[in-house]
């Protein structure tokens, strides 16, 4: 199962490296605002408890670990890796995801994989497993049944 899927972008490796390094410099200067980034991650249906949980989690994020994940995503070429998958695959995407647009990520991945099913969740942002955990759990159970 994939959620908030990013399949990389069309930028060159050099452009992606510059983007990563710009984030590193921003974090080193203390300007990344981890706790304030919930606005970019959550959709309109997120509850007050979800907002609080995400803000708390973001503030506790280890910048070094976060940047390792950013570097991995920037270097990964998801379509070539994913095309080897032959099992049924569930892709869950929030319709209000402002981090990874469905049109340039989840929809392209689903189209490239014959055994993939894409589910778009209304009112949901980049974190469907957090924002709509019960719905996502139901989707997983149905997918595995």
Regions found by a protein language model. Name each.
Residues 95-98, 123-125:
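Acidic beta-to-alpha connecting loop that harbors the catalytic carboxylate
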Residues 114-145:
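Catalytic active-site module of serine/aspartate enzymes centered on a nucleophile-bearing elbow/loop
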Residues 17, 51-52, 102-107:
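Short, surface-exposed alpha-helical segments at coil->helix boundaries
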Residues 63, 102, 129-133:
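Amphipathic alpha-helical segment in the mid-to-C-terminal domain
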Residues 11-15, 29-84:
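Conserved alpha/beta-hydrolase catalytic His-Asp/Glu region
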Residues 1-29:
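Flexible "cap/lid" loop of the alpha/beta hydrolase fold
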Residues 71, 87, 102-111:
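Short alpha-helix in the alpha/beta-hydrolase fold that links the catalytic acid
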Residues 85, 91-93, 97:
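Short beta-strand/loop motif that positions the catalytic acidic residue
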């Amino acid at each position: 199962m994939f959620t908030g899927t990013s399949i990389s972008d069309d930028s060159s490796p050099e452009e992606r490296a510059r983007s990563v390094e710009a984030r590193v410099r921003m974090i080193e200067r203390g300007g990344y605002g981890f706790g304030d980034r919930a606005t970019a991650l959550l959709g309109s249906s997120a509850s007050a408890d979800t907002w609080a949980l995400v803000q708390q989690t973001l503030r506790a994020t280890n910048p070094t670990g976060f940047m390792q994940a950013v570097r991995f995503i920037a270097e990964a070429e998801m379509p070539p890796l994913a095309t080897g998958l032959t099992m049924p695959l569930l892709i869950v995407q929030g319709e209000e995801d402002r981090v990874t647009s469905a049109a340039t990520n989840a929809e392209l991945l689903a189209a490239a994989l014959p055994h993939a099913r894409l589910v778009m969740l209304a009112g949901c942002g980049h974190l469907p497993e957090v924002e709509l955990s019960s719905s996502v759990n139901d989707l997983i159970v149905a997918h595995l049944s």
